[in-house]
Swiss-Prot record:
Primary role: Stimulates specifically the GTPase activity of SEC4, YPT6 and YPT36. Inactivates YPT6 during recycling between the endosome and the Golgi compartments.
Sequence positions bearing N-acetylserine: S2
Identification of the protein by name: GTPase-activating protein GYP2
All residue ranges annotated as the EF-hand domain in the record: 602-637, 638-673
An example Gene Ontology CC term for this record: cytoplasm
The organism of origin for this protein: Saccharomyces cerevisiae (strain ATCC 204508 / S288c) (Baker's yeast)
Rab-GAP TBC domain span: 244-432
Residue segments, region Disordered: 878-950
GRAM domain sequence ranges: 29-116
Subcellular location, record wording: Cytoplasm
Subunit structure, interactors included: Interacts with MAC1.
SUPFAM superfamilies named in the record: EF-hand, Ypt/Rab-GAP domain of gyp1p
Molecular function GO labels: calcium ion binding; GTPase activator activity
Length: 950
């Protein structure tokens, strides 16, 4: 026993140890998550390589490439790892995995050729649709490099149909519009369709100078580093996002960082298809959407017009049909309303998909388990990073989650002015969900002194609300330093969040989530259980403990449904129903006779009848309320109600009569339900009484009939029982009961007058189709009764059925006690527990010495009694529209054909945006090398081609 004691003592430690490990992801899962790739992408090949880039777009001085002092073209060379997936070519540098990141959709590749090299290096020159070139120099064993190239060649050929859709997709890209207008000089191009801000103004009051300066910075970046599906992400990319994304570019940058752009390209036309296929349909989610449409960012003018409301309705409706497990959830309307200001409907739809699946899984679910979990994680971060503030919050019983939960759930859209909330979203899509923790911690840190003066939740909320309303004001209004005085509270918030709390990493958040996940899920499940139990239908024969057990077994059986996550179907199908009943109903447990196909068919027929009877909505599935109502009827303590309910199972037309076929089916149902006792797997009260009587007789014989008091009764310690004898007797009794039932049913059946029952010559034309169908079934049933008497068919009604059952002692006991006792809704079910054999039943009888002794005393006193003995039959235990005026239109905002503006340089030099790690500016991974361009002749040599050109 010392071994088990040791295990018991170590169990709490082992539980804590298990909590310290986070769930491991596969290599492909980590890869997709890091680069926000679609779910069907996986690594096919990977290799070490050096990558350099050459743009085809000339700069303002007419040069397209860097030239060294010798006049030779040069390019930065990045050393790192190159990955190939079915639709992407991904490169990351070896230094910090962020100095150079290229996520290249292979549809953008127009040409691939082997590059000549003086040093005999194995290299490829990849030409993109923009004319830019990517030089890939492989490092490593040559055959591995050739294997990578062969796979790339195969993928390019297979991707030709997708590449044909690229031009249409690029027409929706604003970055493509910028380049076409300012570099290519196209005059007939139209601005891509964007968000509501294109017509209803963007949030805030940005000056034209700053907006154009930001747009110029992004224009320069796209010119040098590519755009949309073929952009190279460098530290400058992240810096430009922190500076602030131009309103016109925000939608594209959001979907690029989130990976929604890849999903939109891969699933072109799916958004429109979902809307068209489900047009006119209704659902609970759509009803909830309609209720919240008017409450979605009402301060923004577009959502006071039908155009804005319709766009929002379309996106939310489409998502509810795409993901029916989630449908529509609280605060989803707020987030999508924020997206639609900067995005088209299709962009917002795919961005919402990736938001729910990748960034904040579980936030927008029926139970909001992700939000609740992150609230607990946030509290742990506050406790760890700001212990004094945390102690004050606990002492004054301030509910931190009351304040912080809307921040996380609405992604700050409803907490701070929109012009600042979208800046948070810029960084959120770049860095992930840790942005929410960092900003939330910074809010508390900045307002800590004021919060320490708050006594309750109301004061706490007022402090935070006032802070958010004054984000545009100076953070240091009393400072003598002008530059210091110009720093706004929002700038201070960004620096605090992303410098002081930069230690909050994704790994820390994942570890904390895993640590608190189990407790949060248990709390959600407990809450859901209590809520559902309170709303269950009224029961007369099931206790609260019974309902609790039924709830547990019901959801335990539905493997696809996760209560804590609120996903999957909460209804039970027929196959699951069979497994459900087998957990606690003796007649439905697996047995030896299940090997017989005839018996198996008989069991399924009865269970299907029971299933259909319980299916109140006639949808082919059972809800929890259906199961509770059905079980309440099944375990009734009233004998007549039990008989009536069993009769109603077969009286499908509800006329109160059973014809011949229905009687035979009812008889088969009785045989099925009584099979455990007929086969001797269990004993009923009559058999137990017989066993006790025999034991008492033996004791009396051995004592010579001289027992006078209870104290004089000595129970035998080694009594043996002839099990086979009692099995046979019980089986014969049940077989005789079944035989008597059929005999008496035919004997006492009531004759049917055909003239009264069915008018064989029906001349009426005022009856409905349904009534005529019922009469036709009655006629067919009566004709089938010809085996009894062709001229005088018979039926049995409910009173006759009662009489037949009550006339047989075995069946009377079955409906009064045995059936009810065989349904173990009062016991916890464990699927792994095996049924106990009959031997254990007899052992239990012998162990109850007091009851046997009392029986002996009654025999001695010659008191004839038939009182029932309270015992368990079966022992197995289981467990307003504001259109932009002329002066508000910035017609030349995206026109950079004029001279370079100095404002964008001032933005780049601002120290408030130098938030990245120090190593970001390091150039250890970057080398400037000579870039040998291909001559016109060599580029056309077929011997150097990998035989792909689209």
């Amino acid at each position: 026993m010392s071994f088990f004691d040791s295990l018991r003592q170590k169990a709490p430690f082992l539980d804590k140890l298990a909590d310290s490990f986070t769930p491991t992801l596969t290599r492909d899962e980590k890869f997709r998550l890091k680069y926000k790739l679609p779910a069907n992408e996986n690594i096919l090949e990977d290799t070490n390589a050096e990558v350099s880039f050459a743009t085809s777009i000339k700069d303002g001085k007419g040069h397209s490439d860097r030239v060294n002092n010798k006049g030779r073209k040069t390019a930065y060379v990045y050393s790192g790892r190159l990955f190939l997936t079915p639709h992407f070519l991904v490169f990351r540098d070896a230094f910090d995995h962020s100095s150079c990141v290229l996520i290249l959709n292979i549809s953008t590749i127009k040409r691939v050729e082997r590059s000549p090299s003086e040093s005999y290096e194995f290299a490829l020159l990849v030409t993109l649709y923009t004319g830019a070139k990517v030089l890939i120099q492989f490092i490593g064993i040559r055959y591995r490099s050739e294997q990578f190239c062969d796979k790339l060649k195969l993928n390019l050929k297979e991707n030709i149909p997708n590449a044909k859709t690229l031009p249409a997709f690029l027409e929706t890209s604003y970055s493509e519009f910028l380049i076409a207008k300012n570099i290519l000089g196209k005059k007939d191009i139209t601005v891509p369709r964007a968000g509501l801000g294109q017509h209803f103004k963007y949030p805030g009051n940005p000056t034209m100078v700053k907006e154009k300066a930001k747009l110029r910075l992004w224009f320069d970046y796209f010119r040098e580093n590519g755009r949309n599906l073929a952009v190279v992400q460098t530290p400058m990319f992240r810096k430009l996002i922190r500076i602030g994304v131009p309103n016109r570019m925000r939608g594209e940058i959001w979907e690029l960082c989130s990976g929604a752009m890849y999903m939109r390209y891969a699933n072109s036309g799916e958004y429109e298809r979902i809307l068209n296929e489900n047009a006119g349909k209704t659902s609970q989610a759509i009803d909830e959407i309609e209720k919240d449409l008017k409450r979605s960012l009402p301060e923004y003018s577009a959502y006071q017009t039908e155009e804005g409301i319709q766009r929002l309705r379309n996106v939310l409706t489409a998502y509810s049909w795409k993901n029916p497990d989630v449908g529509y959830c609280q605060a989803m309307n707020i987030v999508v309303a924020g997206f639609l200001i900067f995005m088209s409907e299709e962009q917002a739809f795919w961005c919402l998909c990736n938001l729910c699946d990748i960034y904040v899984p579980g936030y927008y679910s029926k139970t909001m388990y992700g939000t609740l979990l992150d609230q607990r994680v946030f509290e742990s971060f506050v406790e760890d990073r700001m212990p004094v503030l945390w102690e004050y919050i606990l002492q004054h019983d301030i509910q931190l989650s009351v304040v912080s939960l809307p921040w996380f759930l609405s992604l700050f859209f409803t907490s701070m002015p929109l012009e600042y909330a979208v800046r948070i979203m810029d960084i959120f899509f770049m860095n992930g969900s840790i942005t929410l923790f960092q900003v939330a911690l910074a809010v508390l840190k900045i307002n800590a002194d004021d919060i320490l003066q708050a006594d309750d939740d109301g004061m706490f909320i007022a402090i935070i609300k006032h802070y958010f309303q004054t984000l545009g004001q100076s953070a240091h209004p009393d400072s003598s330093d002008i530059k210091y005085r110009q720093i706004t509270k929002f700038q201070e918030l960004l620096v605090t969040a992303f410098k002081e709390f930069s230690v909050i990493s994704e790994e820390m958040a994942m570890h904390a989530r895993h640590k608190y996940e189990k407790g949060i899920f248990q709390n959600i499940e407990t809450f859901m259980k209590r809520t559902q139990l309170r709303h269950m239908p009224k029961t007369f024969n099931l206790s609260s403990d019974d309902l609790s057990n039924i709830y547990d077994m019901f959801y335990q059986s539905i493997e696809t449904y996760k209560i804590s996550m609120g996903t999957g179907s909460s209804n039970m199908g027929f196959e699951v129903f069979i497994q459900f009943l087998s957990k606690f109903c003796d007649s439905c447990r697996p047995c030896e006779k299940d090997k017989d196909p005839a018996f198996r068919k008989q069991k399924r027929n009865f269970l299907q009848r029971l299933f259909d009877n319980w299916d109140s909505a006639h949808i082919g599935e059972l809800t929890l309320n259906d199961v509770v109502t059905g079980l309440d009827k099944l375990v009734t303590v009233d004998l007549l109600q039990a008989i009536n309910y069993f009769f109603s199972l077969y009286d499908t037309d509800g006329d109160g009569e059973l014809h011949r076929e229905e009687v035979l089916q009812l008889s088969e149902g009785l045989l099925l339900l009584t099979e455990p006792w007929k086969s001797g797997r269990y004993v009923d009260l009559l058999t137990k009484k017989r066993i006790e009587d025999d034991i008492a007789e033996n004791i009396i014989k051995e004592s010579g009939g001289e027992i006078a008091t209870m104290n004089q009764i000595e129970l035998p310690t080694g009594v043996t029982i002839d099990e086979e004898k009692y099995k046979v007797e019980q089986a014969e009794r049940y077989l005789k009961a079944a035989s008597n039932f059929l005999q008496r049913s035919f004997e006492y059946a009531k004759a049917v007058d055909l003239a009264e029952e069915v008018n064989l010559i029906d001349l009426s034309d005022d009856e409905g189709e349904e009534k005529r169908t019922v009469k036709q079934k009655q006629l067919e049933s009566i004709k089938a009764n010809a085996a009894l008497d062709p001229t005088h068919p018979k039926v049995i009604d409910l009173p006759t059925f009662r009489m037949i059952i009550l006339a047989d002692e075995t069946y009377e006991l079955f409906f009064s006690n045995t059936l009810r006792s065989s349904v173990h809704v009062d016991e916890h079910v464990n699927i792994d527990n095996k049924n106990k054999v009959l031997r254990s039943m007899f052992d239990g009888i012998l162990a109850d010495g007091k009851r046997v002794a009392e029986q002996v005393r009654r025999r001695v006193d010659s008191v004839a009694t038939r009182s029932s003995i309270a015992s368990v039959e079966s022992t197995p235990t289981a467990a307003a529209s504001s259109i932009t005026t002329k002066e508000e239109k910035y017609d030349d905002l995206d026109d950079f054909t004029s001279e370079h503006q100095p404002e964008n340089e001032e933005l780049l030099q601002s120290s408030w945006f130098e938030i990245d790690d120090a190593n970001e500016t390091s150039t250890k991974a970057i080398q400037e090398r000579s870039f040998e361009p291909l001559s016109a002749n060599s580029s056309e040599e077929k011997s150097n081609l990998i035989e792909f050109e689209a």
